[in-house]
Amino acid sequence: MSIFKRQWFVLISAVSAALSVVLFPLEVFSASPNSGGGGVQQMNILQAIVLGFVQGMTEFLPISSTAHLKVVPVALGWGDPGVAFTAIIQLGSIAAVLWYFWGDLTRIIKGATRAIALKDYADYDLRLSLGIVLGTIPIVFFGLLIKTFIPDYDSSPIRSLGAIAVASIVMSLLLGVGEKLGKRERDFEHLTMQDGLLMGLAQALTLIPGVSRSGSTLTSGLFMGLQRETAARFSFLLGIPAITLAGLVELKDLLAEGIADGAALPLIMGVISAAIFSYLAIAGLLSFLKTQSTWVFIWYRLVFGVAILGAISAGILQNS
């Protein structure tokens, strides 16, 4: 396939996918869930599996899981599944990233521990682990600020579909600039603690729904001159503490409120579905970025955001 034909194929594929997500609800799934206790919406097993698929495929692709978990169920006529359900199935994504990177994590931890014992502060594994720690601080800091000073953040206008659409469009443009200007010279062995801190600052932007954690960190990595696969791989490692902490906090709050009768099995199936598809998304993206650019995601995010705004303007979706 020529470069020209491949570019058009990527563009058409991205446009078709984005439009289908926003504008073509599947009526076969259209039964709306009823409100359940503990902040979790009652849903059947099929709905939970589908939302687990959405969570898994979008958590690690640079297209925003928060945006899709809000848009897809609304477009399918199910209503908002609730913040609690979203947080619970995120545990599946946590399990997947730990599963995929278990070898890397154990090597880094053992290497860093050994370096500390030997006082070898120039050790690569120690520097990498410190970079991950430094990169986690910004999102924890700003997350605590939001939780403290904006207690109703989950229902604030910044989480509306319109705001999510704008964030998706802006991030698509930034990723496009990063793709164009990034030198892509540095590989995984040349990461620094500064990379961790800078990528961590970008990760903090994901507190704004629609930005995408993997999207913002991948974009920052390209601007810093990292190879695409290196930026994505470090993004996943950097996201482990942040995703884990967020999931555990929401899980604690949910358990304190209690889970409605009949909600446990769909939740479990949603977590399993999210774990399976998260693993596939991680493996697929890393393999894809070895030889391909991020333009398919750039076009997808752009059309996705524009389609949401168009659907809101046409009255197909409510800006809530």
Curated annotation (Swiss-Prot):
It comes from Nostoc sp. (strain PCC 7120 / SAG 25.82 / UTEX 2576). It is an enzyme of class 3 (hydrolase). It is found in: Cell inner membrane. It is a multi-pass membrane protein. Bacitracin is thought to be involved in the inhibition of peptidoglycan synthesis by sequestering undecaprenyl diphosphate, thereby reducing the pool of lipid carrier available. Its EC number is 3.6.1.27. Belongs to the UppP family. GO terms for cellular component: plasma membrane. Keywords: Antibiotic resistance, Cell inner membrane, Cell membrane, Cell shape, Cell wall biogenesis/degradation, Hydrolase, Membrane, Peptidoglycan synthesis, Transmembrane, Transmembrane helix. The keyword Nucleus does not apply. This is Undecaprenyl-diphosphatase. The chain crosses the membrane at residues 9-29, 82-102, 130-150, 161-181, 191-211, 236-256, 265-285, 296-316. Its main location: membrane. One of its GO terms (biological process) is response to antibiotic. GO terms for molecular function: undecaprenyl-diphosphatase activity. The keyword Cell membrane applies. It catalyses: di-trans,octa-cis-undecaprenyl diphosphate + H2O = di-trans,octa-cis-undecaprenyl phosphate + phosphate + H(+). Catalyzes the dephosphorylation of undecaprenyl diphosphate (UPP). Confers resistance to bacitracin. InterPro entries: UppP.
